[in-house]
Amino acid sequence: MLGLFKKKVTVVTHNGSFHADDVFACATLSLWAEKENINLKIVRSRDDNIIKKADMVVDVGDIYDPEKGRFDHHQRGGAGEHDNGIQYASFGLVWKKYGEQICDQEIAKTIENKLVLPIDAIDNGVNVSKNLREDVKEYSVAREMIYPLRFSPDGKGFEHFIEIAKIILKSEINMLRQITDQQKRVEKEIESQLEPEILILNEDIYWDKVVTSHRKIKAAIYPEPDASWWCAEVARDDLTDYNSNRASFPESWRGLRDEALVNISGVPEAVFCHRAGFFAVAKTKEAALEMARCALQN
């Protein structure tokens, strides 16, 4: 019965082919509506009469006026820019108003930088990356996944990708909430262990980003989620650069496992060492700690 009394909001976006910005803009509004217990209806049309009657208009209509629910960026002069100069597309305009209503300010800003900015940039014809190798191309969800269905005559492709976009947004929000909570716990561990060279964690949580600002820490050990194995991993100055490792496991260990690794390392419970030398696995906490110490001495 409660559903009968939901506030109803109609959103109009353009029909025809679609792109990531209008898909994610509508997905954002759908998540906002779910949180606010609003009955949201999405209509795809370029008819001026339908657009005028809509409660919200996204990526069509040539008007940007968030107070009136208008979120287009195609008009002369555009609809403004992000702080870094990238022009807003419809996703960015909608996220600017509703992102913090779906999640908190810090998470909304992170999602803007991670997801909104590249989609807005692509929609405005701005390249944000280049291939470092000619024989390997980057796979973009924003482009490759949407393209095959964006011309679907029955419009089902658009509905399908709104659901995918909602899953992506929910996943990002939930992940960032977990990371924020876990990083606070890591900071407490670092403080309680007096910023050690080897950080000992009793759970598998997001530690690596926190450790980048604690230069004394060279490695961490932590259990697998099911506690069947213990992992030893070196810390990095830059999480995007494996050349910034603060330590490394011995060259002679790399790529070995089980008996071969036990024989060369002298650690009876050693299980595996990654061939790049930044990660190793042991059967026990004590063995993982011993392997981490070897990495620091290497």
Model-derived segments and spans:
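Glycine-rich, Lys/Arg-enriched anion-binding loops that position phosphate/diphosphate groups
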Residues: V126-A235
